[in-house]
From Swiss-Prot:
Described function: Responsible for the deacetylation of lysine residues on the N-terminal part of the core histones (H2A, H2B, H3 and H4). Histone deacetylation plays an important role in transcriptional regulation, cell cycle progression and developmental events. Histone deacetylases act via the formation of large multiprotein complexes.
EC number of the protein: 3.5.1.98
Name the record gives this protein: Type-2 histone deacetylase 1
Active site: 1232 (proton acceptor)
The species this protein was found in: Dictyostelium discoideum
Family under the similarity heading: Belongs to the histone deacetylase family. HD type 2 subfamily.
Superkingdom of source: Eukaryota
Principal localisation: nucleus
One GO BP: epigenetic regulation of gene expression
Root EC class: hydrolase
Keywords assigned: Chromatin regulator, Cytoplasm, Hydrolase, Nucleus, Repressor, Transcription, Transcription regulation
Gene name of the encoded protein: hdaD
Length: 1489
C-alpha cells in the first residue's frame, strides 16, 4: 500500500511507464498490466539458453523469460515484529530504492506505435482508463496501458490462440506488497477532487463518449427488456454513438475500422450472434465488477501474432467460458438478469461527494431519459458519458480484487435490497480510495499529471485474495451525499429539455454518416427500429432501474448477453466522423448545469446511503468468510470488538507467503517447544523455503485455501508476533539498569496488556479450528472430484469393453464391410479417447492438489498442537520471570527505604539536639517543626506520601518497642510470681536473693529506656540492627502475624513426598590461592568435591549443581558495609594473576584493614588487650595487628561471590520445594567475617572474606518473607562474624557450640564479656545441695550486676531448679548475663579435650531451644574441624558423631521447616577427615527415619 509521501512523489514525475509498473519489482505490475505479448526469442536474436521463452508487457515494456521465476524473499525470523505486513517491516522500502531496482523501460518495434501512456492504471486488466485523455489518441493510450486492446476478446485468459506458435506464457509472480506504488483501499474514502477534475476536464474528451455508449445501451436495453426485444435494441444502441471514437482510438494497434468492416454479417435486429467479440468484452468487463461497458465497443478481434493473456485472478475461469471460439456458448438471459447486467459496472459510492459531481449525475440521468424520448442515440451516448463519470464517484467501500468485490464488515450479516443502478455504473478508473485522514480536499491526494495534463487519481491496487474479507478498524459512516436515488432518474428526466436540440442534430449527423457506409439501408432500418423501441421504453425507464435493486451485485459477474455484433460494427462506422464534435459541444453545455443540479441532489440521497449498505450485503452471499466476520459489529462504522485486530487486514499475495508468515511468527518460540515439534516445524520451514515450493503452492486449490484461511492466519500470526514483541520489550526493560527511579515501566496497564495474551488463547484456538475445518472441506471436495473422475473413467472403460464384446459377437462378413465397421468404430472411439486423456490429466492434477492440501492441513495441525500445548506455558513462564523481577525490585526498594528512613531519623534527631542546645525550652518545639519542614522541598509532589511513610515508620518502630517492653514486663511479672512461690520454700539466703531480684526488676524499666534511646541515636552506625521486618510488614500492608504455635506445628509438620539433597560447588573456588603451607588450601575443596561425587554414585537422592552464579552485590551489602566490599574489590583488582597478599597488609607492611581507623581496642576486665591467637602479633593500647592468617589473590573475591551465590541458589531450591535440603561446598569460609571484615576484639578474619551464611539468611528473609530463621554453627571455632551481624535482629536465632580457652581463636563466645553464654557444669549426683547452691549464688551475683530481664528470669529458673536438685543437662546449664546480652544469641563453649559424649549432651540444649523457637528455615555453619584427626583444635569427634548431629538437626527441620535445611561448609583442615565427614553429613541429610 502506497503511503501519502509516495503518492505525492509520483505527482512530480511524468514517465512513459504506468506508475504501478514503476514501483513494482522488476518494473512490471501484474495486477494492472496483465496484457502481455508472446515473442519468440528466435525471431530476434536466436533461441535462448536451453529453449527459454520470452515475453514482454505491451503496457510497460517489461520482458521476462519462462525461466526467470521471481521468488519473493523469505521473511527472516529475527525481524519477527515487522514481517507480516503490519507495521514498518524490512520490506517497506523507499520509492528511490524501488526506482533504482526497477527494470529500465525499453521501447520495441511493437511499442513504438504506442503513444505515451498515462501513469494512471485501471483497477483491473480489461478496463479502459476513463476520462483521462483529451482526444481520441488518449483513449487509445488508456487501452494500451490497461491491457485491453482490440484483440482482447479473441482468446480467453488461459487458452492459446489458434495462430499462436507457443502456449500461454507463465505469468510473473504478482508482487502485491506494501512497497509497490499502489495501495489497497482499507478505509472508506471520501470523493476526492480528482474525480471532479476528471468530470470537468472531460468536457472535451472522447473517452467519456465511449463510456456513454455502454451506459446508454444499458439503459435502453433495460427499456427494451420490458418490450421483449433484447438483442436488437442492445446492439443498435451500443453502436450509434461510438463509431467515430473507436476509429480514432485504435490508431496505435491497428484500426478498429478494418476489424469492424471485416465483420458485417448481421442483416436484421436479431441477426446472427456468431461473432460475439463485443459481447464477450461486455461479459469480461462485467466480470471485473467495476469496468465500464464501453470496452464492449472498444474491443474487437484482430489477427495479430501477439497473444493477449489476462494474468492472475479469478477472471481466468470466467473468460474461459466467454471467449471468441466458435464453440463458445451464448446464454440467453432473463429480463431481470439483463437489467442487472446492463447496470453492473458500479460500486458502492464513497462518502462526501462534491456538489459538482452530484450535479453531473443529475444532468446525466436527465439527459438519458430525454434523449431516449427524442430517439437520438448520439445524445444518449453523450449523456451517458457523464452518467459514467457520476457513477464513478460512487466508490465501493469493499476492496476489489481481480473482478470480485471484497466483502465489507456488514456484508456477512445484513440482508437487504439491491443498490440502485447508479452504483453499478461506476468506472473503476474513476474510483478514489481514502487517504488516512479521510478528508475531502485535494491536499490529501495530489492527482498525478498525465502526459496530456489531465489530473488523475492515485493508482489503486486490488488485493489478491478475492474472497478474503477485509478487516477494517474504525470505519466511518459514509456521507449521505454519495448515491443518486432511483427516483432521481425520473425527476431529472423532466429537467433536460434544453439538450433536445443537440440530440436531434446529433441524430441528423449520424444519418449522414451512415449514408457514407456500405450498408446504409440496414443502418437506417436499424435506427428506425431502435428509435421506436426507445420511444416505447422510455416510460418504463425508472421502473426498470428500480427492478435492478432486486438482484445481487454478485450476480452481475455471471450474466451474459449476446447482441448482434456485426450489426453494431456497421453502425459504428456510420457515425464515427461527426460524433466527436457534437459530444464535445454538448459536454460544455452540460458542465454549466451540473453544479446547480448537484446541490439539489444532496438533500435527496440521505435515505439511500444506508439502504445501499444493506444492498451490498447481498453481493457476497457465496463468500466463505461470513463466519469470520461474525465477531464484528454489523454496522460498518462500528469499531472492532477484538482489540487484538489492529488497523487493517493485509492480505497475502500467495499461499506460500501466508504460510511463511505464520511459521516465522511461531518459530521464534522454538526453545519452548518439544523436540519433535521443533524438528517438524524446521522441516516445514525448510520445505517452504525451497525454490520448488513456489510452483507446488500455486494451484487453484491453493488460491481457494488462501481465500478461506488468509484472514485467520493473519490474526494468528499477528498475535504471536505481538506476543514476541511484548516479551522482548519486557526483557530489554528488565535488563536495563539505567532506568530512572521515577520511571515505572511495569505498571498496571502494561501488565494488563500482557495478561490479555492469555485471554486470547481461546480466540486463537478457534481460529485454528476454523482453518482446519476449511481445509477439511476443501480436501473433501477434491476427493469427491477425484472419485467422480474415477467413476467416469470406469464407466468409459466399461463402454469400451462392451463395444469390444459386441464386435467379437458379430458374424464374419466380407473384408470390405469389416474394414468399414472398424473405421466407424475407431472414429466413434476417438472422442472417447480424448475425453479419457483429459480426464486422466484432471485426475493427476486433482491428486496433486489433494496431496498439497494434506500437507497444508498437517502443517496447521502441527501449529494447532503447538498452540494448545505451549502458548499458555510461554505466557506463564514469562509471568513468573516478571514476578521474580518485581520481587527483586520491591526488596531492593525495601532495603533502600529502610536505610533512608534511618538516615532521616538520624538527621532529624541531630537537628533536634542542636536546637535544644541553641534555643530556649519554650522555642524548642517550634524550631524543631521548622527544621522538619525544611528537610524536604515543599514543591516535591510526593511530599505527602513521603511524610506519611516516615510517620508510619516511626509509629511502627514505637509500637514494636512498646510491645517488646510490655512483653518483657509481663514476662518479668510472671517470673516474679513463680519465683515468689518458689522462694517461700527457700531459706534465708534465698530470701536475700529474692530481694536483690526485686530491686533488679524495679530498675529494668529505666535500663530499657536508656538502651532504647542509645539505640535510636546510634542507629545509623549500627546498621546491622535495622529492623527490616518492620519495613517489610509496612510495605506489604501489614502482612499476617506470626502463626500460633499449634497452627505452625500442624503446617510445618508436613514432610516432603520424596527426600532430595542438592550439593552445590563451583570450580572457581579452587582459584582462591593461599601459601603452600596454609591449612585452608584448595586441596580441602577438591577433597569435598570428590566426596560428593563418590556419594552420588551410592545414592540416587543427591543432585549435584556445579555452576552457581555469582551473587549480586545488593545482597552482599545487606550484610557487609560498602567500604569493606570496595576494599576487597580494589585489593583484588590490583593483584597479579599468581600474586598472594595478606588481607590487611600493604607492600610496606602498613595495615590497610577497614578497622585501622578505629581508636578503640577491646580491653579485658583486667585491663590487658585481648590476645588473638589467629594473628601473627598481638596489640595493646589501640595498635592494630596485621592479618597474617587471611590471604587474598586475584580471584579470591570471585570465589567468595560464587560461594555466596551457591548459598542463595541452594535456598531458592529448598524454598521452592525442588529439594528438601542442600549442602554448599563453600571456599573460602565465612563465619568469621563481620560487617566490616574484622570483628571487634580480633585482628584476623580467620581465612574468611564474605559471611555466606549471613548473606543467605538475609536473602531468605527478604525474598521469602520468613520470620524465623535459625543458624546453627558447630564449627570448632566460634562464629564471631555471624554473631556480630545477627545480634539483636529478632528475625534470626544464632546458636553456636564451640571450643573455648584463653588464646584460642577467636577468643569470643565464652569468656567474660561474651553474650548469650551457656555454661555447662558437669557434676556428680552425690554433690550436696549447698555446693550447687553456692555455684548458683555466684551466677546470681553476676546476673544482678547486669540488669537484663530475660537472663535474670532464666537465672532464677536455674536457681530454683537447682534448689530442687535436678540432674539433667538442661538443669545444669545456666546463661551468663551481661550488659551486652542479645536475646537471639546462644553460645555454648566447651572445654578443650571434651569428650564426644559431652559434646552431644551440650548439643541437646541447641535441639531443645530450636524446638522452642520453631524456625521456618535452618541454616548450618558446618565445620568439621572438631574431628579427632584435625590438629587445629583438641576436640575428639568422629564421623558417626557428625551423623548423629546432622540427623538431630534434620529431624527438627522435618518437624518445623518442612525439611528445609541448608548446610554451608566452614572449617575442616584434615583432608582425609574432611572427606569422611562430608560423606557422613550427606548420608544423614538424605536418609529417612
Amino acid at each position: 500500500m502506497s503511503t501519502i509521501h509516495q503518492v505525492n512523489e509520483m505527482n512530480s514525475r511524468v514517465g512513459e511507464k504506468p506508475a504501478c509498473c514503476i514501483g513494482a519489482a522488476r518494473g512490471h505490475c501484474t495486477a494492472h498490466c496483465p496484457r502481455i505479448e508472446d515473442v519468440l526469442y528466435s525471431q530476434r536474436k536466436g533461441k535462448t539458453n536451453k529453449g527459454a521463452q520470452r515475453w514482454r508487457c505491451k503496457a510497460c515494456g517489461t520482458k521476462w523469460t519462462s525461466k526467470g521465476i521471481i521468488i519473493q524473499p523469505p521473511v527472516v525470523p529475527d525481524t519477527i515484529v515487522n514481517s507480516i505486513g503490519f507495521g514498518n517491516g524490512p520490506e517497506e522500502i523507499s520509492m528511490e530504492q524501488l526506482r533504482a531496482n526497477a527494470r529500465p523501460y525499453k521501447k520495441t518495434k511493437t511499442g513504438d506505435n504506442i503513444l505515451q501512456t498515462s501513469p494512471f492504471p485501471s483497477l483491473f486488466g480489461n478496463s479502459i482508463g476513463m476520462g483521462l485523455g483529451g482526444n481520441n489518441n488518449n483513449i487509445n493510450n488508456n487501452n494500451n496501458s490497461n491491457g485491453s486492446n482490440s484483440s482482447n476478446n479473441s482468446h480467453n485468459g488461459g487458452s492459446s490462440p489458434s495462430g499462436s506458435p507457443i502456449p500461454s506464457p507463465p505469468s510473473p509472480v504478482s508482487f502485491l506488497q506494501r512497497n509497490s506504488n499502489v495501495f489497497v483501499p482499507i478505509l472508506p474514502q471520501s470523493n476526492g477532487n480528482n474525480i471532479n477534475n476528471n468530470n470537468n476536464n472531460n468536457s472535451n474528451s472522447n473517452s467519456n463518449n465511449i463510456n456513454s455508449n455502454s451506459s446508454n445501451s444499458m439503459q435502453l436495453q433495460n427499456n427494451n427488456n420490458n418490450n421483449g426485444q433484447l438483442r436488437s435494441s442492445s446492439s443498435s444502441l451500443s453502436l450509434s454513438s461510438s463509431s467515430s471514437q473507436l476509429n480514432s482510438s485504435s490508431n496505435g494497434n491497428g484500426s478498429s475500422r478494418n476489424l469492424l468492416t471485416s465483420q458485417k454479417s448481421a442483416q436484421s435486429l436479431i441477426g446472427n450472434i456468431n461473432n460475439n467479440n463485443n459481447n464477450n468484452n461486455i461479459i469480461n468487463n462485467n466480470s471485473n465488477n467495476n469496468t465500464n461497458n464501453n470496452n464492449n465497443i472498444m474491443n474487437g478481434t484482430t489477427t495479430s501474432t501477439t497473444k493477449p493473456v489476462v494474468v492472475g485472478g479469478p477472471m481466468q475461469i470466467l473468460n474461459s467460458v466467454v471467449n471468441n471460439s466458435p464453440t463458445s456458448s451464448k446464454p440467453i438471459l432473463s429480463s431481470s438478469s439483463q437489467n442487472l447486467l446492463y447496470n453492473s459496472s458500479g460500486s458502492i459510492p464513497q462518502p462526501s461527494q462534491s456538489p459538482q459531481n452530484n450535479n453531473n449525475t443529475t444532468i446525466n440521468n436527465n439527459n438519458n431519459t430525454t434523449n431516449n424520448n427524442n430517439n437520438n442515440n448520439n445524445s444518449n451516448n453523450n449523456n451517458n458519458s457523464n452518467n459514467n463519470n457520476n457513477n464513478s464517484n460512487n466508490n465501493n467501500i469493499n476492496n476489489v480484487a481481480n473482478g470480485t468485490p471484497r466483502p465489507s464488515l456488514q456484508t456477512s450479516r445484513l440482508q437487504g435490497k439491491l443498490p440502485s443502478p447508479q452504483q453499478y455504473n461506476t468506472s473503476p478508473s474513476h474510483q478514489q480510495y481514502p487517504s488516512p485522514k479521510n478528508n475531502n480536499n485535494s491536499n490529501n491526494i495530489i492527482p498525478i499529471q498525465s502526459t496530456y495534463g489531465q489530473p488523475t487519481p492515485p493508482p489503486t491496487k486490488p488485493p489478491v485474495s478475492s474472497k478474503a474479507p477485509a478487516v477494517y478498524h474504525n470505519v466511518r459512516v459514509p456521507s449521505p451525499n454519495t448515491t443518486v436515488d432511483n427516483n432521481n432518474n425520473n425527476n431529472n428526466n423532466n429537467n433536460n429539455n434544453n439538450n433536445n436540440n443537440n440530440n436531434n442534430n446529433n441524430n441528423n449527423n449520424n444519418n449522414n454518416s451512415n449514408n457514407n457506409n456500405n450498408s446504409n439501408n440496414n443502418n437506417n432500418n436499424i435506427n428506425n427500429n431502435n428509435n421506436n423501441n426507445n420511444n416505447s421504453n422510455n416510460n418504463n425507464n425508472g421502473n426498470s432501474n428500480n427492478n435492478n435493486n432486486n438482484n445481487s451485485n454478485y450476480q452481475q459477474q455471471h450474466q451474459y448477453f449476446s447482441p448482434n455484433q456485426n450489426y453494431i460494427q456497421q453502425q459504428v462506422q456510420a457515425v464515427q466522423t461527426q460524433q466527436a464534435q457534437h459530444i464535445l459541444a454538448q459536454q460544455q453545455a452540460q458542465a454549466q448545469q451540473q453544479y446547480i443540479q448537484q446541490l439539489q441532489l444532496q438533500q435527496q440521497t440521505l435515505a439511500h446511503a444506508q439502504s445501499q449498505a444493506a444492498h451490498q450485503a447481498q453481493t457476497l452471499t457465496h463468500s466463505r468468510h461470513n463466519d469470520l466476520l461474525s465477531p464484528i459489529d454489523s454496522q460498518i462504522w462500528a469499531p472492532i470488538q477484538y482489540s487484538w485486530i489492529q488497523t487493517h487486514y493485509n492480505p497475502s499475495s500467495s499461499l506460500l507467503e501466508c504460510l511463511k508468515r505464520l511459521i516465522n511468527s511461531v518459530v521464534v518460540f522454538s526453545n519452548e517447544l518439544p523436540v519433535d515439534q521443533r524438528l517438524k516445524m524446521i522441516n516445514f520451514l525448510t520445505t517452504l523455503s525451497s525454490p520448488s515450493s513456489e510452483s507446488q503452492y500455486n494451484t487453484n486449490a491453493s488460491k481457494q485455501m488462501l481465500n478461506c484461511i488468509d484472514n485467520s492466519v493473519f490474526n494468528i500470526t499477528k498475535h504471536y508476533q505481538m506476543l514476541y514483541q511484548s516479551i522482548s520489550k519486557h526483557y530489554s526493560m528488565m535488563e536495563d539498569s539505567f532506568i530512572p527511579l521515577t520511571e515505572v515501566y511495569f505498571d498496571e496497564n502494561e501488565i494488563n496488556k500482557f495478561i490479555h495474551f492469555s485471554d486470547q488463547f481461546k480466540i486463537i484456538e478457534e481460529q485454528f479450528e476454523f482453518i482446519l475445518r476449511e481445509l477439511s472441506s476443501i480436501r473433501d471436495t477434491l476427493i469427491i472430484k477425484r472419485e467422480n473422475i474415477e467413476k467416469n473413467i470406469i464407466e468409459s472403460s466399461k463402454f469400451l469393453n462392451n463395444s469390444s464384446n459386441n464386435d467379437n459377437g458379430i458374424e464374419e462378413i466380407g473384408l470390405e464391410q469389416a474394414k468399414q465397421d472398424t473405421t466407424r468404430l475407431l472414429e466413434s472411439l476417438a472422442p472417447l479417447e480424448t475425453t479419457l486423456n483429459s480426464m486422466e490429466i484432471k485426475f493427476k492434477s486433482i491428486q496433486k492438489e489433494i496431496s498439497m492440501v494434506i500437507r497444508v492441513f498437517s502443517f496447521f495441525e502441527l501449529l494447532y498442537n503447538i498452540h494448545i500445548n505451549c502458548h499458555q506455558t510461554i505466557v506463564e513462564k514469562h509471568s513468573r520471570q516478571l514476578s521474580t523481577y518485581m520481587i527483586d525490585v520491591i526488596q531492593q526498594s525495601l532495603y533502600n527505604c529502610d536505610v533512608i528512613s534511618v538516615a532521616y531519623n538520624r538527621l532529624k534527631t541531630g537537628l533536634f539536639n542542636s536546637n535544644n542546645n541553641n534555643n530556649n525550652n519554650n522555642n524548642n518545639n517550634n524550631n524543631n517543626n521548622e527544621e522538619d519542614d525544611q528537610l524536604i522541598d515543599t514543591t516535591n509532589p510526593f511530599i505527602n506520601k513521603l511524610s506519611d511513610l516516615l510517620s508510619k515508620y516511626e509509629n511502627i518502630s514505637k509500637n514494636n518497642n512498646n510491645n517488646n517492653n510490655n512483653n518483657n514486663n509481663n514476662n518479668n511479672n510472671n517470673n516474679n510470681n513463680n519465683n515468689n512461690n518458689n522462694n517461700n520454700n527457700n531459706n534465708n539466703r534465698n530470701r536475700d536473693r529474692d530481694r536483690e531480684f526485686e530491686r533488679d526488676n524495679n530498675s529494668n524499666n529505666n535500663n530499657n529506656n536508656i538502651e532504647k534511646e542509645r539505640n535510636r541515636n546510634n542507629r545509623i552506625r549500627d546498621r546491622d540492627n535495622m529492623d527490616i521486618d518492620n519495613i517489610s510488614s509496612f510495605i506489604s500492608n501489614n502482612q499476617q502475624q506470626h502463626i500460633g504455635q499449634s497452627q505452625s506445628v500442624q503446617q510445618s509438620s508436613q514432610l516432603p513426598k520424596e527426600r532430595k539433597v542438592m550439593a552445590l560447588y563451583h570450580t572457581t573456588c579452587l582459584d582462591h590461592l593461599v601459601p603452600d603451607d596454609h591449612p585452608e588450601s584448595p586441596k580441602r575443596l577438591s577433597s569435598v568435591i570428590k566426596a560428593i561425587n563418590d556419594f552420588s554414585r551410592q545414592s540416587d537422592r543427591l543432585i549435584i549443581k556445579n555452576d552457581p552464579e555469582e551473587i549480586n552485590d545488593k545482597w552482599i551489602l545487606t550484610v557487609h558495609s560498602p567500604e569493606y566490599l570496595r576494599l576487597l574489590e580494589d585489593l583484588t583488582e590490583k593483584l597479579d594473576a599468581n600474586e598472594i597478599r595478606p588481607l590487611n597488609v600493604n607492600n610496606d607492611g602498613a595495615s590497610t584493614g577497614i578497622n585501622q581507623f578505629s581508636t578503640s581496642t577491646p580491653i579485658t576486665t583486667t585491663g590487658t588487650a585481648t590476645v588473638t591467637p589467629g594473628s601473627t602479633t598481638s596489640s595493646t593500647n589501640g595498635e592494630q595487628c596485621e592479618d597474617g592468617d587471611t590471604f587474598v589473590s586475584k580471584l579470591s573475591l570471585h570465589a567468595a561471590k560464587r560461594s555466596a551465590g551457591a548459598t542463595c541458589q541452594a535456598i531458592d531450591n529448598v524454598m521452592k520445594g525442588n529439594v528438601t535440603s542442600a549442602f554448599v561446598a563453600a571456599r573460602p569460609p565465612g563465619h568469621h567475617a563481620g560487617r566490616d571484615g574484622l570483628t571487634s576484639g580480633t585482628s584476623s578474619q580467620g581465612f574468611c572474606l564474605l559471611n555466606h551464611v549471613c548473606i543467605g539468611a538475609k536473602y531468605a528473609q527478604l525474598k521469602y518473607n520468613l520470620d524465623k530463621i535459625a543458624i546453627i554453627d558447630f564449627d570448632v571455632h566460634h562464629g564471631n562474624g555471624t554473631e556480630e551481624i545477627l545480634s539483636n535482629d529478632q528475625g534470626f536465632y544464632f546458636l553456636s557450640i564451640h571450643m573455648f580457652e584463653e588464646g584460642f581463636y577467636p577468643g569470643s563466645g565464652g569468656g567474660v564479656g561474651s553474650i548469650g553464654v551457656v555454661n555447662l557444669n558437669e557434676f556428680n549426683e552425690q554433690n550436696d545441695y549447698d555446693d550447687d547452691d553456692n555455684n548458683n549464688d555466684v551466677n546470681n551475683n553476676n546476673n544482678n550486676n547486669n540488669n537484663n530481664n530475660n537472663n535474670n528470669n532464666n537465672n532464677n529458673n536455674n536457681k530454683n531448679n537447682n534448689n530442687n536438685n535436678s540432674n539433667s543437662i538442661t538443669q545444669q546449664s545456666t546463661i551468663t548475663n551481661n550488659s551486652n546480652c542479645k536475646g537471639n544469641i546462644v553460645n555454648i563453649p566447651l572445654d578443650p579435650k571434651s569428650s564426644a559424649s559431652s559434646f552431644l549432651k551440650a548439643f541437646s540444649i541447641i535441639i531443645d531451644k530450636l524446638n522452642d523457637y520453631q524456625p521456618e528455615l535452618i541454616l548450618i555453619s558446618c565445620g568439621f574441624d572438631a574431628h579427632m584427626e584435625d590438629h587445629l583444635a583438641s576436640l575428639c569427634l568422629l564421623e558417626e558423631n557428625y551423623v548423629e548431629i546432622t540427623r538431630s538437626l534434620r529431624r527438627v527441620a522435618d518437624r518445623w521447616c518442612k525439611g528445609r535445611l541448608v548446610s554451608i561448609l566452614e572449617g575442616g583442615y584434615n583432608i582425609n577427615a574432611l572427606r569422611q565427614c562430608t560423606i557422613a553429613h550427606l548420608s544423614a541429610l538424605s536418609e529417612d527415619d
